[in-house]
Regions:
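A conserved beta-strand-to-alpha-helix junction within the catalytic ATP-binding
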Residues: 56-71
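Conserved micro-motifs of the catalytic ATP-binding
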Residues: 51-56, 93-96
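Conserved glycine-rich
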Residues: 118, 186-187
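Short conserved segment of the HATPase_c
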Residues: 145-159
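Conserved catalytic submotifs in the C-terminal HATPase_c
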Residues: 58, 80-92, 129
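Short alpha-helical segment of the dimerization/phosphotransfer core of two-component systems
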Residues: 31-36
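Short helix-loop "hinge" at the ATP-lid/N-box region of the Bergerat-fold HATPase_c
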Residues: 112-113
Length: 209
Protein backbone atom coordinates (compact mmCIF):
# COMPACT_ATOMS: atom_id res chain seq x y z
CA UNK A 1 0.00 0.00 0.00
CA UNK A 2 2.78 2.45 0.89
CA UNK A 3 4.59 1.53 -2.33
CA UNK A 4 1.46 2.28 -4.35
CA UNK A 5 1.10 5.67 -2.67
CA UNK A 6 4.76 6.49 -3.36
CA UNK A 7 4.31 5.61 -7.03
CA UNK A 8 1.30 7.91 -7.22
CA UNK A 9 3.33 10.73 -5.68
CA UNK A 10 6.18 10.25 -8.15
CA UNK A 11 3.77 10.05 -11.09
CA UNK A 12 2.09 13.26 -9.92
CA UNK A 13 5.45 15.07 -9.97
CA UNK A 14 5.91 14.62 -13.74
CA UNK A 15 6.11 17.52 -16.18
CA UNK A 16 3.00 19.61 -16.65
CA UNK A 17 1.95 18.16 -20.04
CA UNK A 18 2.41 14.60 -18.86
CA UNK A 19 0.66 15.30 -15.58
CA UNK A 20 -2.33 16.86 -17.35
CA UNK A 21 -2.60 13.83 -19.61
CA UNK A 22 -2.58 11.39 -16.70
CA UNK A 23 -4.31 13.47 -14.03
CA UNK A 24 -7.59 11.58 -14.20
CA UNK A 25 -5.84 8.20 -14.04
CA UNK A 26 -3.77 9.23 -11.05
CA UNK A 27 -6.76 10.63 -9.22
CA UNK A 28 -8.59 7.35 -9.75
CA UNK A 29 -5.60 5.36 -8.49
CA UNK A 30 -5.32 7.61 -5.45
CA UNK A 31 -9.01 7.23 -4.63
CA UNK A 32 -8.85 3.45 -5.00
CA UNK A 33 -5.78 3.37 -2.77
CA UNK A 34 -7.64 5.32 -0.10
CA UNK A 35 -10.66 3.03 -0.48
CA UNK A 36 -8.51 -0.08 -0.08
CA UNK A 37 -6.90 1.38 3.03
CA UNK A 38 -10.36 2.01 4.49
CA UNK A 39 -11.52 -1.52 3.62
CA UNK A 40 -8.49 -3.09 5.29
CA UNK A 41 -9.02 -0.98 8.40
CA UNK A 42 -12.67 -2.09 8.52
CA UNK A 43 -11.65 -5.72 8.06
CA UNK A 44 -9.20 -5.43 10.96
CA UNK A 45 -12.01 -4.02 13.12
CA UNK A 46 -14.26 -6.97 12.30
CA UNK A 47 -11.52 -9.55 12.88
CA UNK A 48 -10.73 -7.94 16.22
CA UNK A 49 -14.39 -8.10 17.22
CA UNK A 50 -14.71 -11.73 16.11
CA UNK A 51 -11.66 -12.72 18.13
CA UNK A 52 -13.49 -11.50 21.24
CA UNK A 53 -10.71 -9.17 22.28
CA UNK A 54 -11.85 -7.76 25.65
CA UNK A 55 -13.65 -4.44 25.49
CA UNK A 56 -11.98 -1.53 27.23
CA UNK A 57 -14.93 -0.49 29.38
CA UNK A 58 -14.56 2.96 30.90
CA UNK A 59 -16.70 5.92 31.87
CA UNK A 60 -16.39 8.53 29.12
CA UNK A 61 -17.99 11.76 27.95
CA UNK A 62 -20.36 10.57 25.23
CA UNK A 63 -21.81 14.05 24.73
CA UNK A 64 -18.45 15.57 23.80
CA UNK A 65 -17.59 12.54 21.67
CA UNK A 66 -20.80 12.84 19.66
CA UNK A 67 -20.28 16.59 19.23
CA UNK A 68 -16.83 15.88 17.77
CA UNK A 69 -18.22 13.28 15.36
CA UNK A 70 -20.93 15.66 14.20
CA UNK A 71 -18.31 18.34 13.54
CA UNK A 72 -16.23 15.91 11.46
CA UNK A 73 -19.14 14.87 9.25
CA UNK A 74 -20.23 18.45 8.69
CA UNK A 75 -16.90 18.99 6.91
CA UNK A 76 -17.64 16.42 4.18
CA UNK A 77 -16.50 17.88 0.87
CA UNK A 78 -18.14 15.51 -1.62
CA UNK A 79 -21.72 16.27 -0.56
CA UNK A 80 -23.69 18.86 1.35
CA UNK A 81 -24.01 17.18 4.74
CA UNK A 82 -26.31 18.66 7.38
CA UNK A 83 -25.94 17.02 10.79
CA UNK A 84 -27.95 17.76 13.93
CA UNK A 85 -27.45 16.40 17.44
CA UNK A 86 -30.26 16.00 19.97
CA UNK A 87 -28.75 15.13 23.35
CA UNK A 88 -31.50 14.45 25.90
CA UNK A 89 -29.59 12.81 28.75
CA UNK A 90 -29.01 14.52 32.10
CA UNK A 91 -25.50 13.07 32.35
CA UNK A 92 -22.71 13.51 29.80
CA UNK A 93 -21.05 10.22 30.74
CA UNK A 94 -21.73 6.60 29.89
CA UNK A 95 -20.04 3.23 30.38
CA UNK A 96 -18.64 1.35 27.39
CA UNK A 97 -15.67 0.91 25.09
CA UNK A 98 -15.31 4.48 23.89
CA UNK A 99 -13.35 3.79 20.70
CA UNK A 100 -15.52 0.89 19.59
CA UNK A 101 -18.80 2.67 20.27
CA UNK A 102 -17.62 5.74 18.39
CA UNK A 103 -16.62 3.46 15.51
CA UNK A 104 -20.17 2.12 15.56
CA UNK A 105 -21.75 5.57 15.37
CA UNK A 106 -19.24 6.65 12.72
CA UNK A 107 -20.13 3.58 10.63
CA UNK A 108 -23.81 4.49 10.80
CA UNK A 109 -23.12 8.10 9.82
CA UNK A 110 -20.82 6.99 7.00
CA UNK A 111 -23.61 4.82 5.60
CA UNK A 112 -25.98 7.77 5.78
CA UNK A 113 -23.61 9.84 3.66
CA UNK A 114 -22.95 7.05 1.17
CA UNK A 115 -26.56 6.06 0.60
CA UNK A 116 -28.13 9.48 0.28
CA UNK A 117 -28.29 12.01 -2.53
CA UNK A 118 -26.16 15.12 -2.92
CA UNK A 119 -27.87 16.77 0.06
CA UNK A 120 -27.59 14.60 3.17
CA UNK A 121 -29.57 15.22 6.36
CA UNK A 122 -28.38 13.24 9.38
CA UNK A 123 -29.97 13.43 12.82
CA UNK A 124 -28.08 11.95 15.78
CA UNK A 125 -30.00 11.50 19.04
CA UNK A 126 -28.91 10.25 22.45
CA UNK A 127 -31.20 9.54 25.39
CA UNK A 128 -31.67 7.29 28.41
CA UNK A 129 -34.20 4.46 28.39
CA UNK A 130 -36.28 3.36 31.36
CA UNK A 131 -34.02 0.34 31.90
CA UNK A 132 -30.65 1.94 32.73
CA UNK A 133 -29.58 1.98 29.11
CA UNK A 134 -28.23 4.58 26.70
CA UNK A 135 -29.85 4.75 23.27
CA UNK A 136 -28.00 6.36 20.36
CA UNK A 137 -29.87 6.79 17.07
CA UNK A 138 -28.73 7.88 13.61
CA UNK A 139 -31.45 8.92 11.15
CA UNK A 140 -31.08 10.05 7.54
CA UNK A 141 -32.95 10.99 4.37
CA UNK A 142 -31.28 8.31 2.27
CA UNK A 143 -32.56 5.69 -0.15
CA UNK A 144 -33.92 3.46 2.60
CA UNK A 145 -33.83 -0.32 2.97
CA UNK A 146 -36.61 -2.62 1.79
CA UNK A 147 -38.35 -4.77 4.44
CA UNK A 148 -36.96 -8.03 3.02
CA UNK A 149 -33.40 -6.73 3.33
CA UNK A 150 -33.59 -5.23 6.80
CA UNK A 151 -32.32 -8.42 8.44
CA UNK A 152 -29.83 -9.37 5.74
CA UNK A 153 -27.91 -6.08 5.88
CA UNK A 154 -26.48 -7.15 9.26
CA UNK A 155 -24.86 -10.20 7.66
CA UNK A 156 -21.12 -10.02 7.06
CA UNK A 157 -20.18 -9.24 3.43
CA UNK A 158 -23.83 -8.69 2.41
CA UNK A 159 -24.15 -6.09 -0.35
CA UNK A 160 -27.54 -5.09 -1.71
CA UNK A 161 -28.02 -4.92 -5.47
CA UNK A 162 -31.41 -3.26 -5.17
CA UNK A 163 -30.10 0.18 -6.14
CA UNK A 164 -27.28 -0.24 -8.71
CA UNK A 165 -27.12 3.52 -9.32
CA UNK A 166 -26.31 4.03 -5.62
CA UNK A 167 -23.67 1.30 -5.33
CA UNK A 168 -20.72 2.53 -3.31
CA UNK A 169 -17.23 1.14 -2.72
CA UNK A 170 -17.25 -1.34 0.12
CA UNK A 171 -17.23 -4.99 1.09
CA UNK A 172 -20.30 -5.19 3.30
CA UNK A 173 -18.68 -5.09 6.73
CA UNK A 174 -20.04 -1.90 8.29
CA UNK A 175 -23.32 -3.11 9.77
CA UNK A 176 -21.98 -6.55 10.70
CA UNK A 177 -19.30 -4.74 12.71
CA UNK A 178 -21.99 -2.61 14.37
CA UNK A 179 -23.92 -5.76 15.27
CA UNK A 180 -20.87 -7.47 16.81
CA UNK A 181 -19.82 -4.49 18.93
CA UNK A 182 -23.35 -3.87 20.21
CA UNK A 183 -23.74 -7.56 21.14
CA UNK A 184 -20.33 -7.53 22.85
CA UNK A 185 -21.70 -4.77 25.10
CA UNK A 186 -24.78 -6.88 25.87
CA UNK A 187 -26.86 -4.40 23.90
CA UNK A 188 -29.30 -4.52 21.02
CA UNK A 189 -29.96 -2.70 17.78
CA UNK A 190 -33.13 -1.59 15.99
CA UNK A 191 -33.85 -0.44 12.46
CA UNK A 192 -36.70 1.58 11.00
CA UNK A 193 -36.51 2.24 7.27
CA UNK A 194 -38.72 3.16 4.35
CA UNK A 195 -37.59 2.96 0.75
CA UNK A 196 -37.16 6.42 -0.73
CA UNK A 197 -37.50 8.20 2.62
CA UNK A 198 -34.59 7.17 4.82
CA UNK A 199 -33.38 4.99 7.64
CA UNK A 200 -33.10 5.19 11.39
CA UNK A 201 -30.79 2.81 13.25
CA UNK A 202 -30.64 2.79 17.04
CA UNK A 203 -28.21 1.04 19.35
CA UNK A 204 -29.00 0.45 23.02
CA UNK A 205 -26.16 -0.08 25.50
CA UNK A 206 -26.82 -1.31 29.08
CA UNK A 207 -25.41 0.80 31.89
CA UNK A 208 -25.79 -1.62 34.79
CA UNK A 209 -23.06 -1.21 37.39
Amino acid sequence: MQTLKMCVSVFSAQKTDEKDENALIMETVREESDNLTAYLAKLREVIRAEEHIPLQITSFDIHAALQNLVAVYRKNRQKEVNVSLDYQRTSNRMMGDRDQLLNVVSNLMENSVKYSGDIVNIHVACRDTEKEEVMISVSDNGIGISPDEQQRVWTKFYRSNAYPDMMQPGIGLGLSFVDMIVKAHGGRKMMQSEVGKGTRISIVIPQHS
